Amino acid sequence: MEPQIENRARATCAVETTLAVIGGRWKVLIIRELFPSVKRFGELHRALQGITQKMLTQQLREMEQDGLVHRQVYLQVPPKVEYSLTPLGTTLKPILNSMHEWGTKFLEGQESAQP
C-alpha cells in the first residue's frame, strides 16, 4: 500500500510533512499506545479517554494508509483485528521520546512558576 502522504500536495518543509502525517489530537497518542505491543481496537479505545469509535477508526485508517500502522485481520468468529506499528511507524519513537522529555521539562517549569 502506498503511503497517503504521496497523494497529498507536497509539503514545503520536513516539519510540515511530519505534521501532515502525525498531526492532530489523536495520532501521536495512538502511536504511543502501540509502541509497547500489538493492540486490539477495544484496547486502544479504552486507553484513549475521550476518543469516539468513529474517530479511532478514521485515525487508524489514515495511519494505515500512510504506512505507520499494520492492521491484521484474523478470520474467526467473532472477528479479531489487531493493530501494530510498521517499521516506519517505529521510527517515530525518538520523536515521541523527545516530546515526552520536552513535556516533562515544560510541566516542571510550570509547577516551579506557581506561587
PLM regions: where:
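Catalytic cores of transferase enzymes with a strong primary signal for eukaryotic protein kinases
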Residues: E2, A47, Q59, F106-A113
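Basic amphipathic alpha-helical segments that dock to polyanions
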Residues: L56, L60-M63
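Basic, amphipathic "hinge/linker" alpha-helix immediately C-terminal to the N-terminal HTH DNA-binding motif
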Residues: L75-M99
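Alpha-helical linker/hinge and terminal dimerization helices associated
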Residues: V28, D66, I95-Q110
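N-terminal intrinsically disordered/low-complexity leader segments
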Residues: M1-R10
